[in-house]
């Protein structure tokens, strides 16, 4: 199985002792989070992503790592120092630095991830914006089903189901249109979010009303007229 671990960058770099969070489990103390990140760095199957937040912890930018290109000078230098079969050091720590590229327009630049493992190539992370108010529709899908990146960004913006009081991880939920696609709703971050199968069915009940507000909040109105609001995830910062 896989574990989705979210850790503040300051904790990973040893600049602060702020807790992380394991999806579906809960908070992780900073020392364990740092150890888990170091262990993940030693596993070549680990997938790395970087999320930029605002001052409140809400996600405003995101990107996932890819190997540095073969023409990258830093990668060539790294490959030239490969240490053969020696095991990686147990205390190796991953680190991020700002890359040379600016990334896509309106984004947050390109970052370089070094895992701290001798001989391991660097990874490149290009961070694109998670548009909020207004939405730029850059990842809008032309049909009913979202693309992989749109689905992923929705799961970053909302780490859990947006149903009131639901805690199911977004990776185990459906991408659901708040304004139905058949009624002209866009397949876009401004009109879709993760809903578990139960809340997906509740939302489709004709006596329930669900609206996504410009700031990303989701307003649920019950048949009795009561209203409940869920907000985009606030990450530890």
Outline where the language-model segments fall.
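A boundary/linker detector
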Residues: 1-237
């Amino acid at each position: 199985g896989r574990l989705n671990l979210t850790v503040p960058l300051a904790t990973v770099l040893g600049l602060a002792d702020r807790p992380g969070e394991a999806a579906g489990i809960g908070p992780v103390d900073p020392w364990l989070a740092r150890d888990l990140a170091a262990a993940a760095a030693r596993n070549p199957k680990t997938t790395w992503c970087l999320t930029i937040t605002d001052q409140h912890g809400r996600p405003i930018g995101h990107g996932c790592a890819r190997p540095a290109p073969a023409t990258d000078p830093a990668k060539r230098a790294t490959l030239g120092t490969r240490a053969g079969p020696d095991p990686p050091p147990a205390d190796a720590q991953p680190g991020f630095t700002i890359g040379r590229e600016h990334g896509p327009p309106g984004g947050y630049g390109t970052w370089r991830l070094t895992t701290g493992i001798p001989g391991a190539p660097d990874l490149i992370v290009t961070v694109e914006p998670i548009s909020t108010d207004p939405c730029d529709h850059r990842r809008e899908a032309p049909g009913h089903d979202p693309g992989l990146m749109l689905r992923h960004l929705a799961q970053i913006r909302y780490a859990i189901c947006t149903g009131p009081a639901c805690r199911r991880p977004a990776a185990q939920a459906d991408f659901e249109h708040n304004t139905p696609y058949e009624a002209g709703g866009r397949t876009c971050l401004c009109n879709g979010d993760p809903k578990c199968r139960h809340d997906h069915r509740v939302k489709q009940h004709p006596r329930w009303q669900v609206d996504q507000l410009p700031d990303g909040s989701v307003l649920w109105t019950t048949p009795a007229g009561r209203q409940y609001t869920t907000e985009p995830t606030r990450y530890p910062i």
